[in-house]
Amino acid sequence: MTDTYLHETLVFDNKLSYIDNQRDTDGPAILLLPGWCHDHRVYKYLIQELDADFRVIVPNWRGHGLSPCEVPDFGYQEQVKDALEILDQLGVETFLPVSHSHGGWVLVELLEQAGPERAPRGIIMDWLMWAPKPDFAKSLTLLKDPERWREGTHGLFDVWLDGHDEKRVRHHLLEEMADYGYDCWGRSGRVIEDAYGRNGSPMQMMANLTKTRPIRHIFSQPTEPEYEKINSDFAEQHPWFSYAKLGGPTHFPAIDVPDRAAVHIREFATAIRQGQ
């Protein structure tokens, strides 16, 4: 169904595809931001949950989409510019950004640049909130290596599946994300590593927003109690931050528990409609 909503446009001399269901609703538009090395297909089940009630837009990043291709290097700053340009072309004013994984770097910078009137709230899904631990740092190093990047992806796939035979997620990993080669995976390792280096951690980046506003982290992984504790501690220190555990089996709640993710999106969208 989602591919019927697929469009193309020219953004800063780059031909980008994007999803827009063109639903005429009383705002905000829901802006779903993919992470690296996947595209609008990661959100196809979540779009089904939201389609009837919201305008839903999903930008595909440079080199991403149904026909991935090699492109000049870019990072999350360019992703922010591309997303805002697509919204401007579509005449979208108020929007609720929702990100998956390291699309979170885009979301926070998008909040900074768009300001609280245009983007009053944000939702991040399954984003590693602490500084990279050794295993993840090793994965980033492998992704950057043209000889070993596939080893890096296989290790990440195992972590993300967490021993579960979740058919929808396996299809996404092995059929959809498999479309992407070293150009994209290597770039993801470089950009993510650089983002942690620049910002310290996602929590530090959020805390450094010029104008903070409600942000909620909804996640299934990691499952360690200490991970929930850092979210809880951050929420206690920053009243604008909240979190919710979704209890899904994998790193992809938009695929395996889209109904649970949609509950939080509806809550935040309703608050925006009510001027909160």
UniProtKB/Swiss-Prot annotation:
Which gene is transcribed and translated to give this protein?
Answer: hod
| Entry keyword Zinc | no
Which reaction is catalysed here?
3-hydroxy-2-methyl-1H-quinolin-4-one + O2 = N-acetylanthranilate + CO + H(+)
Effect annotated for changing H38A: Strongly reduced affinity for substrate. Reduced enzyme activity
Family classification: Belongs to the AB hydrolase superfamily.
Question: Where do the annotations place substrate binding?
Answer: W36, C37, H38, H100, S101, W160
Enzyme class of the recorded protein, top EC level: oxidoreductase
Q: Site feature Increases basicity of active site His: at which residues?
A: D126
List the keywords (alphabetical). Answer: Dioxygenase, Oxidoreductase, Plasmid
Name a GO molecular-function annotation.
3-hydroxy-2-methylquinolin-4-one 2,4-dioxygenase activity
What's this protein's function? Ring-cleaving dioxygenase involved in quinaldine degradation and utilization.
Residue intervals of the AB hydrolase-1 domain? 28-150
Q: How does activity depend on pH?
A: Optimum pH is 8-11.
Consequence when changing D233A: Reduces enzyme activity by about half
> Mind telling me what this protein is named?
1H-3-hydroxy-4-oxoquinaldine 2,4-dioxygenase
Please report what switches on or represses expression of this protein. Expressed from a large linear plasmid that contains the operon for quinaldine degradation.
Cofactor: how and how many bound: None. Contrary to most other dioxygenases, this enzyme does not require a cofactor for catalysis.
Q: What effect is documented for mutating D126A?
A: Strongly reduced enzyme activity
Report the source organism: Paenarthrobacter nitroguajacolicus (Arthrobacter nitroguajacolicus)
Name the SUPFAM superfamilies on file: alpha/beta-Hydrolases
GO biological processes: catabolic process
List, from the UniProt record, the residues annotated as the active site of this protein.
H251
Q: Which residues form the signal peptide?
A: none
Give the EC number.
1.13.11.48
Q: Which domain of life is it from?
A: Bacteria
